[in-house]
């Protein structure tokens, strides 16, 4: 079993398959597909623990967004651990991470974003022409139109109307947001 799992080409393919499934959303990549294509001589019972170990290592590396010094320390620890990986496997994992780190990181960033984004904002100030109360007619109102959409799809528009009090509340909240961002951006 150990000899069959040592091949660097097969391990590189396995890591690519795991990355495609875990980080790039290709859900058709199953453990049976990986085993039959890359390790056909290994039984499913022997392959499962190896697959789980490699999946865990890859997820640990990606979730920590390891730089190459951290990666080297992590892989060295894995080679010294009982039931860990071999130094040849560590070399393949290191090479794989060096070649795929940027794409995996971008994919994780895209997965963590809110789907829709603000594409545009327009506003104007009008005089209110209709109201239940006659005293509110001809009072100024701010009308804001937000264009919201996902990339590659048609936008949706949201129209908001604010009186003077609501504009003041909105500006106060935006000032609080700006202050929080400024606080977080200051060097420690």
Curated annotation (Swiss-Prot):
Cu cation binds at residues 100, 109, 133. Ubiquitinated; undergoes both 'Lys-63'- and 'Lys-48'-linked polyubiquitination. Ubiquitinated by XIAP, leading to its proteasomal degradation. Residues 124-188 are annotated as: Required for binding to PtdIns(4,5)P2. It is found in: Nucleus; Cytoplasm; Endosome membrane; Cytoplasmic vesicle. Residues 1-122 are annotated as: Sufficient for interaction with SLC12A2. Keywords: Copper, Cytoplasm, Cytoplasmic vesicle, Endosome, Membrane, Metal-binding, Nucleus, Protein transport, Transcription, Transcription regulation, Transport, Ubl conjugation, Ubl conjugation pathway. Signal peptide: none annotated. The keyword DNA-binding does not apply. It comes from the Eukaryota. PROSITE patterns: COMM. One of its GO terms (biological process) is regulation of proteasomal ubiquitin-dependent protein catabolic process. GO terms for cellular component: Cul2-RING ubiquitin ligase complex; cytoplasm; early endosome; endosome; endosome membrane; nucleus; recycling endosome. It holds the Pfam family COMMD1_N. Residues 117-185 form the COMM domain. GO terms for molecular function: copper ion binding. Its main location: nucleus. It is linked to Defects in COMMD1 are the cause of copper toxicosis (CT) in Bedlington terriers, a genetic disease occurring with a high prevalence worldwide and is unique to this breed. In Bedlington terriers the biliary excretion of copper is impaired. Component of the commander complex consisting of the CCC subcomplex and the retriever subcomplex. Component of the CCC (COMMD/CCDC22/CCDC93) subcomplex consisting of COMMD1, COMMD2, COMMD3, COMMD4, COMMD5, COMMD6, COMMD7, COMMD8, COMMD9, COMMD10, CCDC22 and CCDC93; within the complex forms a heterodimer with COMMD6. Interacts with VPS35L; the interaction associates the CCC complex with the retriever complex. Identified in a complex with an E3 ubiquitin ligase complex composed of TCEB1/elongin C, CUL2, SOCS1 and RBX1; in the complex interacts directly with SOCS1 and CUL2. Scaffold protein in the commander complex that is essential for endosomal recycling of transmembrane cargos; the commander complex is composed of the CCC subcomplex and the retriever subcomplex. Can modulate activity of cullin-RING E3 ubiquitin ligase (CRL) complexes by displacing CAND1; in vitro promotes CRL E3 activity and dissociates CAND1 from CUL1 and CUL2. Promotes ubiquitination of NF-kappa-B subunit RELA and its subsequent proteasomal degradation. Down-regulates NF-kappa-B activity. Involved in the regulation of membrane expression and ubiquitination of SLC12A2. Belongs to the COMM domain-containing protein 1 family. PANTHER family: COMM DOMAIN-CONTAINING PROTEIN 1. This is COMM domain-containing protein 1. It comes from Canis lupus familiaris (Dog).
